[in-house]
Amino acid sequence: MAAQRYRPNRIRLLLVAESPPEDPARYFYSEDARSTDPLFDAVCEVLFEGERADKTTALKELKRRGVFVVELKPDSPRGESKLAAYVAPFLINLETLGPEQIVLVGDDVHAAAYRAIDKAGLPAVDVKVPDPAAGDQASFRNKLRQALVRGGLEKLIKPLPPSARAKV
């Protein structure tokens, strides 16, 4: 699976999205250069301060910085499923990942999982970061920055190294 190739040894920031997209080409870890994923684009825009890189280079840089993305409902697109049913198994997996900070992406994900993660003593940042796929990119960028600062991870926000920048 592509995500495992980009899993950092030490996860500093774990972003928890709702579920994988229906179109596999829109998956966060899809290496297809033509793929477009609103979450991937928005995360890179914040963490790389707007600088562009090809997708594989950006994925490698996210791994180097300790950033990893998982889904609360990892098996298939959500559809009409209740996310609360996925929280207990998710908590078991969280302990094996050992993230320094957890940021929940999307109001439904936050509503379903934040209290349980916090009650389990895991390091969840209590900032409601909207899903960028819902169309509010500006709010996503602001809230993700806020979550990074609250979680003590503001140093993750920095330009790409010169060797990783896209050639224009």
Descriptions of predicted regions:
Residues 1-132:
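A polyanion-binding, active-site-adjacent surface
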